[in-house]
Amino acid sequence: KIGINILVITNNSQVFSEYYPENVITMNFEHWRESIENIRKWSERYDLKAVIGVDEESIILAAKLSESLCIEHNSLESVKLTKNKYLMRRELKKSGLKSPWFKRFSIDEKPKDIFTELRFPCVLKPTFLSASQGVLRVNSFKDFVKGFELLSDLLTEMKVKKRGGDQVKWILVEEYIPGKEVSIEGIVNEGKLKDLAIFDKPEPLEGPIFQETILITPSILDEHLQFSLLETAQTALKALGIRKGPVHIELRINDKGNYILECAARSIGGLCSKVLEFKGAMSLEELILRSALGRNIEKTQLIDKVVGVMMMPIEKSGILKEIQGIKEALAMKGITDLQTTIKPGEILEPLPKGDRYLGFLFAEGKNQDSVKTVLQEAWSKIVIVFEEI
């Protein structure tokens, strides 16, 4: 559609690599230098202009490849800041943004030895995981001990250790921030944030786990507050050194001000981006590509309608047998799509240890209440058939 050649760099074999072998390179992300010459040759042939990480696992690699190939990108240091919640908190505090109290503890610490350093309620979280994995609110020292042990166990699991490197040795403890939660989707160009959407999260996220479910845009917050949120986001991006590419920023709002929860140098996760439709029949992914190529996206606007997405939660552990009620949910007025992301036979693991959703429900309506209601009603028709482990 936009007349470009794409090279897919993946750590998993892709079905279409059989049909487009010149456009797919499969590699071990940890040993990327072994494949750099193949990428360089492709670049010489097709004039590689940008390297884009599409998820949490690939954004560091994108920065490394860009640096090696002398392609404009966020610095490796700045991307690493977004991937380490402790370092991010430290930088945001230095910038003068509102910050909760926070402290990092080794998983080898004994809770009784750090009791005097704690204030309740507080939140425990790994420094590197996403999708609310391992994030727990605790209201007492008894809860803290249980939560600390749970996270210590999670951080010693092999697949988690492989992702986290040295960060698996640490648990971040920070003040629980009450208030309404929102997220901002945007693209940064030369350090300036172009906001694409502000998502409201109409269901309260108060713990003990933080299961995100419904996102709705456009926001119904007043314009002054929305402007304030964008100012906070811009300050955070400057503090972290993010100057280019897609960003996904999460914030809490209360009577004390705006607090950054997350600032990721990537677009929104999962299939959530499907809910965003821009004038000119453009998707979020197309906008990201256009911006990466230096094309002007400043006048881009969302199509004027109220839309929402529900990340269908995993509520119990087991082996998935079947998801029932999909046809009934899709038949509801206002539901525009439903896509599952876990197949029968796969293991279901709920938060706080899990990191996946059953799938995604999409809806549109005349206002936020109608979108929220139809998503909740459609979800009520879904029945998960599973086998206990």
Where in this protein do the model-derived segments appear?
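Beta-strand scaffold of nucleotide-dependent catalytic cores
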Residues: 136, 146-150, 172-174, 181-202, ...
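Short beta-strand-to-turn element immediately C-terminal to the catalytic PLP-Schiff-base lysine
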Residues: 105, 135-140, 187-189, 254
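Peripheral (often C-terminal) accessory segments that flank ATP-dependent C-N-forming ligase machineries
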Residues: 94, 111, 289-389
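Conserved ATP-binding module of the ATP-grasp superfamily
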Residues: 98-101, 121-124, 141-178, 209, ...
